[in-house]
A protein has these predicted regions:
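Acidic (Asp/Glu-rich) sequence patches and key acidic residues
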Residues: 2-138, 142
């Protein structure tokens, strides 16, 4: 099965405010607004790839970010996500990047975050209140 970022096709700046999610066959995993998803990718690129988008995690950052992930690349994406999750644990929540294209942009909630958020690996929570990385893993597992 193919994993898709639903509702955006090819991800563009002008549609970041649309609701998005991961779609695998008939399964839909709600994420939230496109600008939230862009923040996840921006945070990874800025903190883990020295701002060089896709240089360390090309399957997730390039292929999936463009809208689809081929079934043949799901295992690679899972391995990349494991590394991302592990490495984000070393960064405090204040290292979040809302928009790598404009580093002055801040999350709508500012610094007002839950005490449960201890690092960037558990910073991102979907619009359904679920841990983003857990939902991402679930979608990738379903896509196998």
């Amino acid at each position: 099965m193919t994993l898709m970022i639903l509702s955006i096709g090819i991800y563009r700046k002008e549609i970041r405010h649309m609701a998005v999610g991961f779609k695998v066959a008939f399964f839909y995993y709600q994420i939230g607004h496109g600008d939230f998803l862009h923040s996840v990718f921006s945070t990874v690129s800025y903190n883990l790839e020295n701002g060089k988008w896709g240089s360390r995690f090309p399957t997730i950052m390039n292929e999936l970010y463009q809208g689809t992930l081929d079934k043949d690349n799901v295992e690679t994406a899972i391995e990349e996500l494991k590394k991302i999750q592990l490495e984000l644990q070393a960064f405090s929540p204040d290292k979040v990047v809302w928009d790598i294209d404009d580093l002055s942009n801040q999350p709508p909630w500012g610094k007002n975050i839950s005490n449960d958020i201890t690092n960037l690996s558990n910073y991102f929570v979907t619009s359904d209140g679920e841990d983003f990385i857990t939902i991402f893993f679930n979608a990738l597992e379903k896509a196998k």
